[in-house]
A protein has these predicted regions:
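Non-catalytic DNA-binding core/recognition domains of DNA-processing enzymes
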Residues: 14-99
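C-terminal alpha-helical interaction appendages
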Residues: 1-12, 41-44
Length: 100
């Protein structure tokens, strides 16, 4: 992941703190899933990873942990957490699309 370029690109579209949050979420995905977002983008435009990051309200009601393997604290809202992570990764893939 090209952290610096991504953050600079984000700052053109949103405020500094939001850009840092999106970047940190993407870094968390890379670290916890042992992947590189650039590799995922090259593989299939990121669609495989985005599918792995999907988490439904039904899964939340059933108290299921995410299938991708990410762990959350006991009282965390996993649905919101997973959707925030997915939105950040989707934004990274959007950024990558502007570089091609």
């Amino acid at each position: 992941m090209n952290e610096a370029k991504f953050r600079t690109w984000l700052e053109k579209h949103m405020n500094y703190h939001t850009a840092r949050t999106y970047t940190a979420r993407c870094m968390r995905i890379e670290e916890k899933l042992f992947i590189d977002l650039d590799d995922e983008y090259r593989k299939d435009g990121g669609s495989g990873l985005l599918n792995r990051l999907k988490y439904s309200r039904d899964e939340q009601r059933q108290r299921k942990q995410p299938q991708c393997g990410l762990k959350f604290e006991e009282n965390a809202d996993i649905y919101i957490g997973m959707n925030s992570l997915g939105a950040s990764v989707k934004k990274y893939f959007e950024f990558r699309g502007t570089e091609d």
